[in-house]
Amino acid sequence: MSFSLKKKHKKGGRKPKLSVENILVMYLKYYRDYNTFFSLGNIFGINEANAYRWIKWCEEIISIAFKSMINEITNMTKINSMHEHLVDVTECSVQRSKNQEIQREYYSGKKKKHTIKIQIIMDEITKKIVGIAFDKGSVHDFKLFKNSTTNLNSSIAFLADNGYLGIQEIFSKSLTPKKKSKYNPLSDEDKEFNKLISNIRIAVEHVNCQLKTFRILSERYRSRLETFNLMATLICCFYNFCL
């Protein structure tokens, strides 16, 4: 980053007030606490516009540094067919659009608000995030899964919740909890099977909780929706990098 900063100012001009370290801290603080740019400017002694510029500059540099990892998890090229994978969807609140058509697309009936869905695929052995996909809040979890996994080998095994009923038709080795019906209650073996799947799947839900320690994901997203995917993908890269 220091090299990029020197290159940015190689033609001279006024030197930046912040060091590379402080710029990085400001960027991480923005993701972690989701301060306004005005608040960040006051904390670091710069104006609001410069706080915005430095965060966008830092985001661009980090996305270049993590380019290969970003490609791996967005294209799902590191999914190992010999391992089991856990899949889950979390929703992040976004601002309501003035356009009624867009409102309907992003409205989540489950959350009763406008959201973007993030699908996380985690390797059960390595605990790393190996796949990520996004869609509007109105899209069903299983539809998001089908749309994002069209290029994957059908021999891959996924563990999913009851929202993914029918996944075995696409990935035959996959498992979902058994459902009871009015005339077919669950046997003791079925209950033990469901408990086993839940105990394994809890790991991916813990990952979602860890990602949402970044308040930019847990609070309503205030920026343009076009920037959301890169931001969320970078946070997943941070998680993988720290393992």
Predicted features and spans:
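Short alpha-helical "packing" element that flanks the helix-turn-helix/winged-helix DNA-binding module
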Residues: 23-27
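Short amphipathic helical patch at the helix-1/turn junction of helix-turn-helix
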Residues: 30-32
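Basic, low-complexity segments
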Residues: 1-17, 114, 184
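Short, well-ordered secondary-structure "scaffold" segments embedded in the functional core
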Residues: 18-20, 34-243
